[in-house]
């Protein structure tokens, strides 16, 4: 199953969404792709978002979605990935948009729940993940 959600607010909102997704996943694994929105918001909630993402089994972090903004040094998708309290084998920063769906599909198995969270164009990737998974059957 592939599920998408908006999580551009504080880490507590992301944590609630992930806790609900964990219930939906049941005995399956929860695999999450996350794209933070705005550099200033990411800077403020970096640790909270990272902790929330730790509720997943596997996490793929994209670069911050911040069109027209000036980057803040030290605030990035890579910095977000470093905040996720999971074994490094289960957290990846994927800077290449075209590789994200494949990363998620590679991690997913029967009964798993793949969830996209964040703002920007992350929600567009769900159909691509489903297509890859169908082709692999």
Predicted regions, residues:
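ATP-dependent carboxylate-amine ligase
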Residues: 1-137
């Amino acid at each position: 199953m592939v599920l998408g959600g908006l999580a551009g607010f504080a880490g507590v909102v992301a944590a609630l969404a992930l806790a609900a997704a964990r219930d939906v996943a049941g005995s399956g694994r929860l695999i999450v792709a996350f794209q933070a929105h705005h550099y200033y918001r990411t800077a403020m909630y970096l640790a909270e978002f990272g902790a929330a993402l730790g509720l997943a089994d596997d996490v793929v972090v994209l670069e911050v979605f911040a069109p027209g903004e000036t980057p803040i040094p030290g605030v990035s998708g890579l910095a977000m990935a470093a905040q996720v309290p999971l074994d490094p084998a289960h957290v990846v920063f994927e800077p290449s948009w075209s590789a994200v769906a494949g990363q998620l599909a590679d991690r997913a198995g029967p009964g798993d729940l793949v969830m996209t969270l964040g703002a920007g164009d992350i929600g567009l990737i769900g159909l691509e993940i489903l297509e890859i998974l169908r082709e692999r059957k």
